Amino acid sequence: MTNGHPRITHLVQNALESNGVLDDTNEIQYATKFTAQFESFRAHILVYNTGKIVVQGRLSPLVTWLQHVNTSIKAGRSIPAFEPPID
């Protein structure tokens, strides 16, 4: 059983898994907390039982992508793929 909103939790988890950035999942009070990691970039995306989504972490390409995931879900659009930075 998930503490976060079931449909949104499922969407976020699928996005993180399909882009290969899901590192960890934790159930916290009133939310599901996902940890995403790509190379040295690490960020969190929390899905609350109300449907609210919160992105946490230092500004990085990963955080920017998680913010796009958030706005895409809110707008009912498809979630964009994560495009890692080119060195």
Where are each of the predicted segments found?
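Acidic (Asp/Glu) carboxylate-rich active-site/surface patches
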Residues: 27-32, 48, 78-87
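Non-catalytic propeptide/linker segments at domain boundaries
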Residues: 61-87
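Intrinsically disordered, low-complexity regulatory segments enriched in Ser/Thr/Pro
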Residues: 42-65
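Short Lys/Arg-enriched alpha/beta "domain-start" segment
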Residues: 1-43, 64-72
